[in-house]
């Protein structure tokens, strides 16, 4: 894998950062050595953060370049024209038809305004049949219940 010019520059910066903070070779009292190590550790954490920012900046620039490349490659693509969604039937009041629970399963009473019997699909809770919220469903159930 060959490195590009920007990658080499980023690695050179990171190498310089880490080379600028060698581990302390200090003689002295235990307290002086401990403080020197603590200072080194804090500086090393700062260098780690800076190196992370350098790499993230490089990766972000690389990502932006890749996105621009993709945009150029795909600029000629056109979305297909999709068909219109199915039309929702509305009655004269402007209220759309909905699916709602109707009669319990096993009941052969008419549960739709067309007068057909219903075979429940939800077990004992009932089935789903298209009805209108305007109240015509209740009227059709009453008329279907009368023999």
Curated annotation (Swiss-Prot):
Position of sequence motif Nuclear export signal: 70-82
Region (Disordered): 24-44, 83-120
Ranges of biased composition (kind: Low complexity): 111-120
Keyword RNA-binding: yes
Keywords from the UniProt entry: Host cytoplasm, Host nucleus, mRNA transport, RNA-binding, Transport
UniProt entry tagged with the keyword Transmembrane helix: no
Positions of the UniProt region annotated as Homomultimerization: 13-21
Biased composition (Basic residues): 31-42
GO cellular component, one term: host cell nucleolus
Domain of life, source organism: Viruses
Segments carrying motif Nuclear localization signal and RNA-binding (RRE): 29-45
Chief localization: host cell
GO MF annotation terms: DNA-binding transcription factor activity; RNA binding
Matching Gene3D superfamilies: 6.10.140.630
GO biological process terms on file: mRNA transport
Compartmental location: Host nucleus, Host nucleolus; Host cytoplasm
Alphabetical list of Pfam families matching this protein: REV
Function: Escorts unspliced or incompletely spliced viral pre-mRNAs (late transcripts) out of the nucleus of infected cells. These pre-mRNAs carry a recognition sequence called Rev responsive element (RRE) located in the env gene, that is not present in fully spliced viral mRNAs (early transcripts). This function is essential since most viral proteins are translated from unspliced or partially spliced pre-mRNAs which cannot exit the nucleus by the pathway used by fully processed cellular mRNAs.
Domain description: The RNA-binding motif binds to the RRE, a stem-and-loop structure present in incompletely spliced viral pre-mRNAs. This region also contains the NLS which mediates nuclear localization. These overlapping functions prevent Rev bound to RRE from undesirable return to the nucleus. When Rev binds the RRE, the NLS becomes masked while the NES remains accessible.
Subunit annotation: Homomultimer; when bound to the RRE. Multimeric assembly is essential for activity.
Protein name (Swiss-Prot/TrEMBL): Protein Rev
